[in-house]
Swiss-Prot record:
Name of encoding gene: lolO1
Domain called Fe2OG dioxygenase: residue spans: 199-312
Pfam families linked to this entry: 2OG-FeII_Oxy (PF03171), DIOX_N (PF14226)
Membership in a protein family: Belongs to the iron/ascorbate-dependent oxidoreductase family.
Stated name of the protein: 2-oxoglutarate-dependent dioxygenase lolO1
Pathway where this protein functions: Alkaloid biosynthesis
Natural source organism: Epichloe uncinata
One GO BP: alkaloid metabolic process
Keywords: Alkaloid metabolism, Dioxygenase, Iron, Metal-binding, Oxidoreductase
Amino acid sequence: MTVTNKPVKPANVPVMDFEAIHASVGNERKKYLRQLDEAWSHHGAIYVINHSIGTRTLEEAFAWCKKFFDLPLAVKNSVHIPPDVSKHFQGWTGTGEAISSQGVWDPDEIERLRKETPTELKEAMELQDPCGTYPPGAPDLNLVEQHLPGFLDFLKKWFAACYKQSLQNMRLVCEILGMEDLDYIGKKFEPRHMSTHSTWNYFLGQPVSQLASGSANRLNAHTDYCQFTMLFQDMVGGLELHDYEEDIYRPVPPIKGAMIVQVGDLLEKQTNGRWRSALHRVTAPSRYMYEGSAGDDDELVQRYSLVFFGHLNLDEMIEPLPGCEKQGKWSTLEWKDRMTAGQWLARRVALEYERKTAATVM
């Protein structure tokens, strides 16, 4: 089939070199901080090169991710996410079990969307800090370790690396906002508090024609419910970011070794709308959607992504940060109730995963 979607230019997301930023001083540093401020306000996202996680750790992470999703269904089911996922946010989910949505708060409306919209053709593994204390009823990752020796050791390495980078992100936020204490946010951000988590995604191969026509889907448009998202794509592509000015989605092509740092709902709320929570989705790579042609029988290659969500400690109230007393331009998601980060997380997770009737695992 020939893809007839009109050509769309990629999102103009800036590429920021964190090594250069951390080494900068004086006016050069002020320039970098201003660029970050503008990017998170306009796009809600940046590319980051030369980050602290490193190429080797990323390559290991993608290898472990693929090994996990290649496991037999029975093994993955042994660590299936519990029905009350808002209390035990860890475990594997199969195709059709979760649904991403934006601004839908009614569980009945979520059920209608599940029935009437294309299924998100992906599997996911939700992971919490392996050094943390899990509540009773949480899936036992030792069941994965039995089939993938070294899995838990790598998870410890992965969380430590992502946590280190997250703290660097938070220090930059504090510096941009003019705080004297650059660890102000980091002190409210502890991985073993069991709020911060990582998601590994496996997007199944499917005909390009289905994605281009909208009859199939990979990941619905949504914002993330954290402070910052650190996203690592493979080189397949398919991520798109909403352009509010043109009201279209623009591709965010992968850059090898780079991470994408996106503002989440919590940070938009904490900055009082100064920065924008990034509305994004996953579909076919732009070369199929907008630029070329593919035969009807062509299968879209599989896609993997690794995501780390930086999140406030669960007992912290969601309120504006120092320096953000003035109302900004963004209000991506409205919620008037004053609540803790834990209440917000439970609310969003329950809508995404919990349902009235059991899903069929594919």
